[in-house]
């Protein structure tokens, strides 16, 4: 069929993307929303629409607690990762000529699967783990430290390590993009190194910091592998509860509701964070 | 050092590995002057300027500003400010905050700072632009912001690295005059780097001409034009026809020469040339040559020529002519005065020149190196 107008041409060109987005984003999301308004009876789904899932989920202290803790842990992970990533990105952007080599080294953890990396931390932090046996062997401690594993600390540490490259790259890119003459101009106008960093470099890398933070924060809120493996009882997060609904508890409508609640929460926190950082950036003169 | 000196460079040298970007630079700048460093791209102008600003440390030599040795003073504590080639306007700040950037440590109150900023913006004719964002500005406006940002610091010396090179021609010419007026009204010493001879000529009190890291001549534009000290300077400032000559007698104020193609003439001695020899070189500016259909009257020398090519510039016409005995094609520039002269390609014509228009360029080194190569 010949294409006659620009409009039809445009539609034809856009069709694959539309199809892709429709099948992979809109359809699953639509199903999730639909499920959240249905009810699980013993074996079947009751398709009459109801707010009951939302009411019971929001009313459940465990849900609120897990949601809050997920956001809290994700915020800690994000903060720690970005704080660690910034100096590394700065070093690669400004202090070395071997940028490619360093960037390659940073991605090395990605050469193994994520699951293996989590298990590696288990081996390091565990009761008979590398750290405990090493320190015992050196005579620095007499009995294994048990606070290392199965808690929030282990989750934050494992995730911060896993996300490091994702945090470094956006910050590195934004540092690399800074016109070096801007730094010279600041020096020329009397700024010392520290002042120059806070008044020029940092505000110009806020977009990089925002991308880094969101790249880490958003998936971390929904992570369930790490808390399941190294989190123990008080390291559990909202995703673990969601997973239970879709698995053992077999309550898909409640699982869908919890997923949507988590998504909305992440959305609100993320938008608030972006606005806050933009505002802080605009206050720097 | 006289009381008037503001910058004094002595024996300043900058090496990057095996490359010597600036060699043995001696220079004294006077308070309140507009000085330009002129030279082709890559000759070391920017490096010299950056050493004055403190962005680059000299490999050897000393730099004094207003009597104080600043060789080891970091850039942020030097009494100089710079207008960067790309302007380097802070993209995250508005115009007012850009201009006020350096006033933070001045101890001025917020109100005083604001007054200084708006005063500086008035100076560059951007009054009321405080709250504009940098990306809303045209190239010319960014240039003015950069200028205001540096001037607001009230530096002893303002450094400008090719400040106009990014502007289009009309704006550039307007800005040349404006910068010059501004400099005269505020009386701060300006040091400008440029590769554009016209820019340097129209704006500067004095020009330093640099080649290959070496300062070849420092003089007023008029002197550089009338009495260039070397062939390179003569070639870089304005157009120049070079002619080999024989020096017969160098007694008194004039030199008796036999000039290729133009015959015997008594040429005025160039005070900026020290070295004379039997193999001599002279120069004639294209605009100092008369071209006519018949042998022109009243010239010290006239020769016949053939028009090889013509270039039309609007305000002037350039004829490229061949003269018997002159090795290179000569250029004749004629003002486009109601098309008073009009030759076609291949036509025969006459050239006339006054002895006073012939510039003595000293010993002909080209000739010597050629002969040296042959032996
Ligand atoms: N930081 C540097 N490292 C190595 N070489 C440099 C550096 N800066 C300038 N150069 C070299 O020094 C020479 C002079 O450069 P520059 O001062 O920028 O010239 P100009 O401003 O006259 O065009 C050039 O050959 C340039 O490549
Ligand atoms: Mg330069």
Where are these regions (language model features)?
Chain B
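Helix-to-loop junction immediately C-terminal to a conserved catalytic motif
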Residues: 53
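Non-catalytic connector elements of ABC transporters
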Residues: 240, 250-375
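The feature captures the beta-strand-to-loop junction immediately N-terminal to the Walker
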Residues: 38-40
């Amino acid at each position: 069929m010949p294409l006659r107008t620009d409009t039809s041409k445009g539609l034809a060109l856009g069709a694959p993307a539309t199809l892709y987005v429709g099948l992979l984003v809109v359809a699953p999301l639509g199903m999730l929303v639909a499920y959240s308004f249905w009810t699980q009876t013993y074996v079947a789904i009751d398709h009459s629409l109801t707010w009951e899932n939302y009411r019971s989920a929001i009313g459940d202290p465990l849900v609120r607690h897990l949601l809050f803790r997920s956001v809290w842990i994700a915020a800690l992970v994000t903060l720690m990762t970005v704080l660690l990533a910034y100096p590394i990105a700065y070093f690669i952007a400004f202090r070395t000529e071997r940028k490619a080599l360093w960037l390659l080294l940073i991605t090395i953890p990605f050469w193994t699967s994520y699951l293996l990396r989590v298990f590696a931390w288990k081996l390091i932090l565990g009761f008979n783990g590398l750290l405990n046996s090493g320190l015992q062997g050196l005579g620095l401690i007499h009995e294994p430290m048990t606070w290392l594993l199965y808690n929030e600390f282990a989750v934050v540490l494992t995730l911060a390590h896993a996300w490091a490259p994702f945090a470094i790259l956006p910050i590195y890119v934004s540092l690399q993009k800074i016109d070096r003459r801007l730094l010279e101009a600041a020096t020329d106008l009397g700024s010392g190194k520290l002042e120059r960093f806070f008044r020029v470099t940092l505000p110009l890398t806020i977009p990089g910091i925002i991308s880094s933070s969101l790249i880490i924060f958003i998936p971390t809120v929904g992570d369930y592998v790490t808390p399941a493996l190294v989190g123990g009882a008080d390291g559990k997060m909202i995703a673990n509860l969601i997973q239970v609904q879709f698995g053992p508890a077999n309550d898909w409508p409640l699982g869908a509701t919890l997923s949507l609640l988590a998504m909305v929460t992440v959305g609100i926190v993320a938008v608030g964070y972006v606005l806050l950082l933009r505002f802080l950036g605009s206050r720097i003169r | 050092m006289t009381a008037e000196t503001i910058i004094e460079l002595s024996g300043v040298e900058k090496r990057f590995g095996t490359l010597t970007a600036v060699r043995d630079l001696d220079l004294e700048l006077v308070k309140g002057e507009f000085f330009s460093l002129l030279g082709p791209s890559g000759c070391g102008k920017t490096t010299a300027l950056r050493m004055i600003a403190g962005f680059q440390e000299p490999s050897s030599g000393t730099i004094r500003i207003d009597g104080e040795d600043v060789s080891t003073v970091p850039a942020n504590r030097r009494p100089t400010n710079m207008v960067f080639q790309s302007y380097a306007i802070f993209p995250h700040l508005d115009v007012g905050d850009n201009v006020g950037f350096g006033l933070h440590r001045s101890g001025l109150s917020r109100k005083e700072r604001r007054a200084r900023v708006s005063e500086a913006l008035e100076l560059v004719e951007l009054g009321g632009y405080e709250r504009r964002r940098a990306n809303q500005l045209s190239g010319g406006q960014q240039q003015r912001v950069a200028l205001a940002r540096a001037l607001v610091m009230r530096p002893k010396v303002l450094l400008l690295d090719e400040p106009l090179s990014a502007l289009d021609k009309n704006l550039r010419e307007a800005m040349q005059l404006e910068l010059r007026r501004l400099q005269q009204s505020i009386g701060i010493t300006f040091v400008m780097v440029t590769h554009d001879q016209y820019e340097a000529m129209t704006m500067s009190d004095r020009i330093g001409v640099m080649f290959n890291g070496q300062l070849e001549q420092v003089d007023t534009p008029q002197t550089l034009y009338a009495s260039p000290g070397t062939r390179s300077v003569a070639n870089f400032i304005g157009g120049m026809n070079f002619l080999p000559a024989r020096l017969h007698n160098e007694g008194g104020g004039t030199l008796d020469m036999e000039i290729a193609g133009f015959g015997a003439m008594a040429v005025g001695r160039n005070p900026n040339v020290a070295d004379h020899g039997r193999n001599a070189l002279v120069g004639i500016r294209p605009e100092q040559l008369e071209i006519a259909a018949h042998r022109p009257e009243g010239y010290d020398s006239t020769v016949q020529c053939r028009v090889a090519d013509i270039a039309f510039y609007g305000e002037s016409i350039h004829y490229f002519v061949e003269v018997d005995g002159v090795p290179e094609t000569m250029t004749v520039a004629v003002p486009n005065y109601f098309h008073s002269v009009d030759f076609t390609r291949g036509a025969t014509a006459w050239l006339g020149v006054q002895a006073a228009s012939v510039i003595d360029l000293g010993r002909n080194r080209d000739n010597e190196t050629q002969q040296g190569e042959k032996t």
